[in-house]
Swiss-Prot record:
This is Glycine--tRNA ligase beta subunit. Signal peptide: none annotated. Its EC number is 6.1.1.14. GO terms for molecular function: arginine-tRNA ligase activity; ATP binding; glycine-tRNA ligase activity. Belongs to the class-II aminoacyl-tRNA synthetase family. GO terms for biological process: arginyl-tRNA aminoacylation; glycyl-tRNA aminoacylation.
């Protein structure tokens, strides 16, 4: 079967840069889906995207759809005709389903059967519908119309190229008649560009100053930016999302170095970086110490004969932005950070929970409660908590919301606050996402935990639980943040106490009954997903969860111990024994016996197990007290042999009630040893 390369390019006005990659991938996926549905084979697929175009290249696409056969079985003959040979409703219904007369149905076999051979269509006749369907299915939240046309798309369309081999596909899509003429760079080559063949698409456009391959543009920008940064004795800050956005803004990228006045470096560099990245799409430069250099890199969409004009233009544009940041910084410093706190009395945190000022006071008290329990200073944590939200009322944060916490840090230092108190104002928001940085100070950790617990308790306390994908107060992220800080920073905080303190701080604003348990359940449930991501079996998590440890660090240490235990050869058998013992003890009416008396032993294996349990108990008590859980379980693994011998030789449910109770007590002691670490019966 013959095959040809297929190219489709839709030309438009400038597409939304942040959506360009998504649109391109969806365009390719839609075309691929259409080709597969039509049974059309091909060799490879490529997608290209630039500010004014979306294109897909399919290599070695079959030029003819294969023939196909339809074979449908109907009702049995005896059900299809009555005794007189007249067709029943079953037969007539089958014919109607097939879209033919009953006479066209094969009646020779045990069942009615309809067979049809469908001849394949030329690929060229199928492509317009495939392309149009793909464009209609693009994830475009809001489509627009232009001129007096009825067609809708994300931006007005300007041209359409559709080639199968050397032939133009005759069609009109989104008000554009297909041809072989594309367009070059808006300034360098504004005239049309003839695409000589699908395989020459990239080369033909490159000659017209258009790099249609986004990956090529991205690599060029990244490489050239790094080279220019090195020449400036610096390192460029190139966030992946900013690089993608800049790549989507230019067809012929030309990175250039610009500068700004050094006086602006007195402003917190985070504010300067934020405005240059978010508003101007610039790449900022840092020196070897991580300090901002008074230079930046812009990516022009033109190869100018006089690049100095472009450089000066960008320097002129950025100056008012930096001047604004400088003004806000100076204005805010005219008063102490603490003075902004009163303004927060008029800023609502949550209607039922009070103002942001109220929240800061609660955070202050809770942070002071937490700090000494994780090795910190209560007074400093209280101070940091009180100042934690002050910068929300500053002009800097009002203009640059991303500066919350960061602005507070600089203003606190300006006021002479201790370094760890100042740092805590920024670290309270950590971690800002999955895998993000954690607080570096104990004071910061205490405030971060307090802030998150206060939000969790407050929102749960008014019944606004997260549901499905809706989590407006980011409670899941808050819970995971608390867990990450405690586990990864190795802080042994009893969350039972901390959550109870947080509940009491709200007073009558929340429904306190059962609230602490609800919040704790939610927090520790987040560990399940965390461990699953780390490859920890859910049974391991559940074995520890059954004990309800209050410390996240302790919880994690137990999980790691159970993970190690499960690799031991004795693990499976001991888990099964614990399951058996658990089932036996659960059937006892009343309290489980606790007294073991050797006089009721009537089998040597009972003596052996009792002796082994006593020895193990003595050995593991100091281990468990020191939280050496792996060592504890490894030592208990030695009980497998006497346990197996006991169950082989001893009938637990003896007829004599005292003997039976004695054996229950022995098994309860055995199970209690393991429960010092986890309920390993869950592993069976």
């Amino acid at each position: 079967m013959s095959a040809q390369d297929f190219l489709v390019e839709l030309g438009t006005e400038e597409l939304p840069p942040k959506a360009l990659n998504t649109l391109a991938e969806a365009f390719l996926a839609g075309i691929e889906k259409g080709l597969q549905s039509a049974g059309l084979s091909f060799q490879a697929k490529h997608v290209y995207a630039a500010p004014r175009r979306l294109a897909v290249l399919i290599t070695q696409l079959a030029t003819q759809q294969p023939d196909r056969s339809i074979n449908l079985d109907g009702p049995p003959r005896q059900a299809a005709f009555d005794a007189e040979g007249n067709p029943t409703q079953a037969a007539l219904g089958f014919a109607k389903k097939c879209g033919v007369e009953l006479s066209e149905i094969d009646q020779s076999g045990p069942k009615l059967r309809y067979s049809q051979s469908i001849k394949g269509k030329p690929t060229a006749s199928l492509l317009p519908t495939i392309v149009e369907d793909s464009l209609n299915d693009l994830p475009i939240p809001k489509r627009m119309r232009w001129a007096a046309r009825k067609e809708e798309f994300v931006r007005p369309t300007q041209w359409l190229v559709m080639l199968l081999g050397d032939e133009v596909i005759d069609c009109t899509i989104l008000a554009q008649k297909a041809g072989r003429d594309s367009r070059g760079h808006r300034f360098h080559h504004p005239q049309s560009v003839r695409i000589t063949a699908p395989a020459n698409y990239l080369a033909d456009l490159r000659a017209a100053y258009v790099l249609a391959d986004a990956n090529e543009r991205r690599e060029l920008i990244s490489k050239r930016t790094a080279e220019l940064a090195t020449l400036q004795e610096g390192t460029a800050i190139v966030p992946a999302d900013l690089l993608d956005e800049v790549t989507a803004l230019v067809e012929w990228p030309v990175p250039l170095v610009c500068s700004f006045e050094e006086r602006f470096l007195e402003v917190p560099q985070e504010a300067l970086i934020t405005t240059m990245q978010d508003n101007q799409k610039y790449f900022c430069l840092l020196d070897v110490d991580g300090k901002l250099l008074p230079r930046f890199i812009t990516v022009a969409n033109i190869e100018s004969k006089d690049p100095r004009q472009i450089i000066e233009g960008n320097e002129k544009v950025v100056r008012p932005r930096l001047t604004d940041a400088e003004f806000f910084f100076k204005q805010d410093k005219k008063q102490k950070l603490e003075d902004f706190n009163l303004r927060l009395q008029n800023v609502v945190f949550q209607e039922k929970l009070g103002s942001v000022y109220d929240k800061a006071e609660r955070i202050s008290k809770l942070a002071a409660f937490i700090a000494p329990r994780i090795g910190g200073d209560a007074q400093r944590a209280a101070r940091a908590g009180l100042l934690s939200k002050c910068d929300l009322a500053t002009e800097m944060v009002g203009e640059f919301p991303e500066m919350q916490g960061i602005a507070g840090y600089y203003y606190a230092l300006n006021d002479g606050e201790p370094e760890d108190v100042a740092l805590a104002l920024n670290e309270q928001y950590m971690p800002r996402g999955a895998g993000a940085e954690l607080p570096s100070t104990v004071t910061g950790a205490a405030v971060a935990i307090a802030d998150k617990l206060d939000t969790l308790v407050g929102i749960f306390g008014i019944g606004m639980l997260p549901t499905g994908s809706k989590d407006p107060y980011a409670l899941r992220r808050a819970a995971l943040g608390v867990l990450r800080i405690l586990i990864e920073k190795k802080f042994d905080l009893d969350l039972n106490d901390a959550v109870a303190f947080a509940v009491s701080a709200f007073g009558s604003k929340v429904k306190a009954a059962g609230l602490a348990d609800q919040v704790l359940e939610f927090i520790f449930d987040r560990l399940r997903a965390r461990y699953e991501d780390e490859g920890v079996d859910v049974a391991t998590y559940l074995s520890v969860r059954a004990l309800k440890p209050g410390s996240a660090l302790d919880f994690d240490q137990r999980v790691q111990a159970v993970q190690a235990f499960r690799k031991l050869p004795e693990a499976a058998a001991l888990a099964a024994v614990n399951k058996r013992v658990s089932n036996l003890l659960s059937k006892i009416e009343g309290n489980v016996p606790t007294t073991i008396e050797a006089k009721y032993f009537d089998n040597a294996n009972e003596f052996s197990l009792y002796s082994a349990i006593q020895q193990a108990d003595q050995a593991v008590q100091p281990m468990a007290a020191a939280r050496q859980y792996s060592e504890t379980l490894a030592r208990l693994a030695a009980l497998r042999e006497p346990v197996d011998a006991f169950f082989e030789a001893v009938m637990v449910n003896a007829e004599d009630a005292k003997v039976r109770a004695n054996r229950y007590a022995l098994l309860a002691r055995l199970r209690g040893l393991f429960l010092g670490v986890a309920d390993i019966s869950v592993l069976s």
